[in-house]
Amino acid sequence: MAATDIARQVGEGCRTVPLAGHVGFDSLPDQLVNKSVSQGFCFNILCVGETGLGKSTLMDTLFNTKFEGEPATHTQPGVQLRSNTYDLQESNVGLKLTIVSTVGFGDQINKEDSYKPIVEFIDAQFEAYLQEELKIRRVLHTYHDSRIHACLYFIAPTGHSLKSLDLVTMKKLDSKVNIIPIIAKSDAISKSELTKFKIKITSELVNNGVQIYQFPTDDESVAEINGTMNAHLPFAVIGSTEELKIGNKMMKARQYPWGTVQVENEAHCDFVKLREMLIRVNMEDLREQTHSRHYELYRRCKLEEMGFKDTDPDSKPFSLQETYEAKRNEFLGELQKKEEEMRQMFVQRVKEKEAELKEAEKELHEKFDRLKKLHQDEKKKLEDKKKSLDDEVNAFKQRKTAAELLQSQGSQAGGSQTLKRDKEKKN
């Protein structure tokens, strides 16, 4: 019997019974809170936007501190993601905050692939968590979760419409991260222009099918405030770490020749709304949505690529063991097929090599025969030449002998005549 069937039977047959006295499991929420507080929390924010829109300043303002960071320039050859992690403490609650900023976003002439490094970074964090989950010995409670929980998308305060770069990037990211669009440096445009700009942005997002993060309304305790805040998206924000004295209080504000803009004055901007929604009310929901929605989508796609499925082709439940066995058999079949292909390839290559060697041997024999015949011909020529030379030598010797004989005969005849003449003179 499958585990799902057992669970279903237990659920259907479960009875509600009263307790005769106090047991103690009502302290489970307190236990969970104490454990969570002791372990601490992590929250990862991705700031996407063009250089100079005040991403770093807004982060400083949101968390009421000064994060150390290098200023970005407009001369980056491509988009780079810069990640910094900080340990924050508020009361007795610890928060490991990671801020990831897109350096050089929108600064290139060709912006077609500007979104790719961002998508690759988000997927890399999902992949790292998945690899940790798939380990035999998992230590997820000590693992530093680097998955992005919230993406603050900074929109330039043009007052007209979204840039094509913004639409393309948000469309590529909406299935991977919780996008919260915000209008940066909103004090650069008038209130009437800002209202029209918000409407225009919302309309373009809907028309292009971009899914932004909606504050949850299923929890009664926050349903009203979240429903109200959803209507204010995208938030128009201003960031400032400078404090000015307004009345009798020191407040974060920006001083202009025409007046003062207070960061925490809701009549001036939506900074307080953003801080409340992002940190105080919905931080845990953002973490949960990242794990249960975006990460699960990535995990499911990856496991399906690996061949793991929950159901067979007939939509019947498929256990992990059955999936493993099916995948193992498939792998063994592929392995045998590969082995047979390699064997056939090896045999074919051996035959080809044998044919090459036979052809080479034949060529060597033919070359040997040619050289042998050439050697014999040369030898015969040399023998004929030697015989001819020997004949010439013998003929020369014969001629020499004859000449010497004639010479000796001539010498003897000459001597006889001389003696004869001498005798005649004496007489």
From Swiss-Prot:
Annotated segments matching region G3 motif: 101-104
Region annotation G4 motif: where it falls in the sequence: 184-187
Chain residues that bind GTP: 49-56, 104, 185-193, 239, 254
Domain Septin-type G: 39-305
GO molecular function terms noted in the UniProt entry: GTP binding; GTPase activity; molecular adaptor activity
Subcellular location: Cytoplasm; Cytoplasm, Cytoskeleton, Spindle; Chromosome, Centromere, Kinetochore; Cleavage furrow
Keywords: Acetylation, Cell cycle, Cell division, Cell projection, Centromere, Chromosome, Cilium, Coiled coil, Cytoplasm, Cytoskeleton, Differentiation, Flagellum, GTP-binding, Kinetochore, Nucleotide-binding, Phosphoprotein, Spermatogenesis
Compositional bias annotation for Low complexity: 407-417
GO biological process: cell differentiation; cytoskeleton-dependent cytokinesis; protein localization; spermatogenesis
Keyword Cell cycle assigned: yes
Membership in a protein family: Belongs to the TRAFAC class TrmE-Era-EngA-EngB-Septin-like GTPase superfamily. Septin GTPase family.
Complex formation: Septins polymerize into heterooligomeric protein complexes that form filaments, and associate with cellular membranes, actin filaments and microtubules. GTPase activity is required for filament formation. Filaments are assembled from asymmetrical heterotrimers, composed of SEPTIN2, SEPTIN6 and SEPTIN7 that associate head-to-head to form a hexameric unit. Within the trimer, directly interacts with SEPTIN2 and SEPTIN7. Also interacts with SEPTIN9 and SEPTIN12. Interaction with SEPTIN12 alters filament structure.
Full protein name: Septin-6
Species for this entry: Bos taurus (Bovine)
Organism lineage string: Eukaryota, Metazoa, Chordata, Craniata, Vertebrata
Gene this protein is translated from: SEPTIN6
